Amino acid sequence: MMNILLPLLGGFIITAAFMPALIRYFRARHEGQMIREEGPTWHEKKSGTPTMGGLLFIVAIAVMTLLTSWVLAPHHMLPTTWILIFILVLYGALGMWDDSIKLFHRQNEGLKAWQKMLGQIVGALILFWVYTHEQLPMALHVPGIGNWHMSGWYAVFVILWLVGFSNAVNLSDGLDGLVSGLASIAFAAYGIVAWQQAQINIAIFCFAVVGSLLGFLIFNHKPAKIFMGDTGSLALGGALAAVSILLHHELSLLWIGLIFVIETASVILQVASFKLTGKRIFLMSPIHHHFEMKGWSEWRIDLTFWGIGLVTALSGVWVILAK
């Protein structure tokens, strides 16, 4: 039980204790988020809010994962522990580079798409290398059917999974607290699965994420005092995809992370519809902005999406463990 409580509480305490200092630092330097012009007009009042808060919870996650593994479970300090931290840090570094361009060069576009994708692919290939080195199955687990052996094609899947979900979480990060809550729920679900399946190193990592995000949520709920930025959202998305792969429950993420899937699908459908017919399906995409345009408050959207995320996470865990 301490393997769960230590990273959970430690991550929470580190993030909650040091986040005020990070907020003061960014405010003193007058560095804050630029709000994209195509978003809701009332989001303009958020302009100048400190960003890159993900930097602190990435540090908290890494510290508590390594500390807990070293103190309580040194025999669980496996290559999979290191690759999860590596993916978290690499994708976070990509996001931080992107955020830095927006902050210091006052360009709201950030990195070019190909630059971001190249870094994401490199991280995915390194994850695949560790996966094969650990002699994990080169097969995709399909619920209700069994394992679909993919051989070398599994590398393609790993790339698509990490790139896809890191961008999906990034797209979802458009409301105060939304991704912090959704990611906490999803990582808690996989932490329970990992614990029950005796993959303690992955459970430690997952609960370090949960604790750190809950500490961050204190400052990120509406009205947000700081945003996680691409630094946080890309890191969380990449790590979440990596966890589902290492647990060999890859496709479960489509259900446990259903809101992320819906957010991404809404953007794809919106763009496709406008290109093909000249008409938009939603008032604005991603879909959380559609509900804003319908008059929903940010808190109402957050609570609704968190509720859906909790239901899909609990039911997903039940299905996995029922086997």
Swiss-Prot record:
Q: Which cofactor does it need?
A: Mg(2+)
- Enumerate the GO terms in the molecular function aspect: metal ion binding; phospho-N-acetylmuramoyl-pentapeptide-transferase activity
Annotated pathway, please? Cell wall biogenesis; peptidoglycan biosynthesis
- Looking at the UniProt entry, the stretches that span the membrane are 3-23, 52-72, 77-97, 121-141, 145-165, 175-195, 200-220, 226-248, 301-321
Per UniProt, which keywords does this protein have?
Answer: Cell cycle, Cell division, Cell membrane, Cell shape, Cell wall biogenesis/degradation, Magnesium, Membrane, Metal-binding, Peptidoglycan synthesis, Transferase, Transmembrane, Transmembrane helix
One GO CC term on file: plasma membrane
Primary localization: membrane
What's the Enzyme Commission number for this chain? 2.7.8.13
Topological category with respect to the lipid bilayer? Multi-pass membrane protein
Asked if the record carries the keyword Cell membrane, the reply is yes
List the residue ranges forming a coiled coil, or say none: none
Where is this gene product found? Cell membrane
User: Which reaction(s) does its UniProt entry say it catalyses?
Assistant: UDP-N-acetyl-alpha-D-muramoyl-L-alanyl-gamma-D-glutamyl-L-lysyl-D-alanyl-D-alanine + di-trans,octa-cis-undecaprenyl phosphate = Mur2Ac(oyl-L-Ala-gamma-D-Glu-L-Lys-D-Ala-D-Ala)-di-trans,octa-cis-undecaprenyl diphosphate + UMP
GO biological process terms, semicolon-separated:
cell division; cell wall organization; peptidoglycan biosynthetic process; regulation of cell shape
HAMAP family in alphabetical order = MraY (MF_00038)
Function summary: Catalyzes the initial step of the lipid cycle reactions in the biosynthesis of the cell wall peptidoglycan: transfers peptidoglycan precursor phospho-MurNAc-pentapeptide from UDP-MurNAc-pentapeptide onto the lipid carrier undecaprenyl phosphate, yielding undecaprenyl-pyrophosphoryl-MurNAc-pentapeptide, known as lipid I.
Q: Which family does it belong to?
A: Belongs to the glycosyltransferase 4 family. MraY subfamily.
The protein depicted here goes by the name: Phospho-N-acetylmuramoyl-pentapeptide-transferase
Annotated source species: Levilactobacillus brevis (strain ATCC 367 / BCRC 12310 / CIP 105137 / JCM 1170 / LMG 11437 / NCIMB 947 / NCTC 947)
